[in-house]
Each structure stands twice: as C-alpha cells, then as structure tokens.
Amino acid sequence: MQIHKLCFLVLFLANAAFAVKFNFDSFDGSNLLFLGDAELGPSSDGVSRSGALSMTRDENPFSHGQGLYINQIPFKPSNTSSPFSFETSFTFSITPRTKPNSGQGFAFIITPEADNSGASDGGYLGILNKTNDGKPENHILAIEFDTFQNKEFLDISGNHVGVNINSMTSLVAEKAGYWVQTRVGKRKVWSFKDVNLSSGERFKAWVEFRNKDSTITVTLAPENVKKPKRALIEAPRVLNEVLLQNMYAGFAGSMGRAVERHDIWSWSFENAAKNN
C-alpha cells in the first residue's frame, strides 16, 4: 500500500514538473520571441494596436514573421510517449490594408525550433517553404486562419480554417464560421453562421487536444460570443507522431502582394501534464 502511494507521489511530482499554464490579456514582449517581422503592434500606425502581437509589417513587401512563447513547452513525457492534453485560446483580428484583395493569413503553430530563417512568405504563412513542405520530419502543427485561396495547397476558399500537419495543405479545413444552437418547438437545431476573417473584427479561437482519444478540435466565434458548444473542426489521431517532448508554441503569419495586419490581442495556454 505504501509502495503504491509512493509510486503515485513520484508520478504526480514528475507530471507536475511538466505542467505549463499562462494567460496574457495583452503583450509587453517580455515572454515572447520575435522572429522575422514579428513585433509588438505600435500605437503610432493609426489602428490602435498597442499591446498586440503582430506577425507582419505594412512597410515590408511579402512580410512574414513568428511570435513564440519564450520557453519550450512540454508536450510529451518523452519523444516515444503519448502527448499530454492541452488547450489554448486567443483573440485575433486580420485587417486588410489594400483592397479588394487580402492575404495571406496566420496560424497558431507548435514547432520544434525557434527559427524561421527558412520560412517563406505568401501561402507558406511564414512557417515552411517549397523545399520542406510536406516532410514528416518537420514536426509542425499549424491551425491556419487563411484569407487567400492558394490552389497549389488545395485551399477550399480564401476564408477558411484548417488543421495542417507538416504541410501547408490542410488535413481538414472548413469555411470560417461558427455553430449556433436554437430551439424550434421541442427540437434543438444547429445553424451555421459565416464570418469574414479579414473583416478587421476581433474573433476568438479555441484549440484543444484530448489525450484520451487523440482528437484535436478547433472552435471559432466573434470575440463577444460565448464559446460555441459545437466545434468548427474535429480531427482525430493526428498528433501522436507530430509532437515531440519539448516544443515552442505561438503564431506565424505572412503577406503576399496584398497587405494585411495579423494581430493577436490575448492568449492563454495550459497543458494537462499534472492530470495525466
């Protein structure tokens, strides 16, 4: 009995050492790594972006960058084990600076390296490039919020959300929007509401991974709307071979010929290492 208690305590303490939790209501730069053109949004650019994390700069053609949490985050007890459950949420806005076109979008990313020196702009979203796109050794998860239809990546539209594994071609993609449940008589009915990602409005996204069934879900809604009970995307069994023991998490974004701003206004993250 005592041995069982001791084993449980050792396991609990070991898992607690892996636990990570943070919540940024705004950013001051002290807990972030800025790669490429990523920066804290200046208050002097006419769109009141002070305190936002931005991946691109208007003055730089084909701008791209990454903003990552300063420390690596444990996603597995070891490289050969199953991933911890985790959940993250963030508010963002995408604002076109040239009309009528927008592009290209941004993504929440989990990546093994804090290095975007080989990343490309345009449809590669500042994450990958033509040479390494699609390679399993990338070990990259990207939840993309895409505002330009790149046919070479089989994009379903110029306004969609996708789950990408080691590639800019989405494993699963859905048009941008959210589900609303209403009561019609005695029945509950789901209806879908479209949103325009590049409207300049603020949206909130939730990304959750469940260890018990290896499923990742993505949920989206306008900032002032309560989290929908139905996810926009549900992708099963995609992360076991992708995630490594320690990785970086954050955001990447890029522009093509059209100029748009990608601003992250708040961000929270928690892994469930202490509960595994």
Swiss-Prot record:
Gene3D superfamilies: 2.60.120.200. GO terms for molecular function: carbohydrate binding. Residues 20-270 are annotated as: Legume-lectin like. One of its GO terms (biological process) is response to chitin. Keywords: Apoplast, Glycoprotein, Lectin, Secreted, Signal. It is found in: Secreted, Extracellular space, Apoplast. Residues 1-19 form the signal peptide. Glycans are attached at residues 79, 129, 196. InterPro entries: ConA-like_dom_sf, L-lectin, Legume_lectin_dom, Leguminous_Lectin. GO terms for cellular component: apoplast; cytosol; nucleus. The keyword Signal applies. Induction: By oligogalacturonides and chitin (e.g. chito-octamer and crab-shell chitin CSC). Accumulates upon Hyaloperonospora arabidopsidis infection, during both early and late stages of infection. SUPFAM superfamilies: Concanavalin A-like lectins/glucanases. The keyword Coiled coil does not apply. Belongs to the leguminous lectin family. This is Lectin-like protein At3g16530.
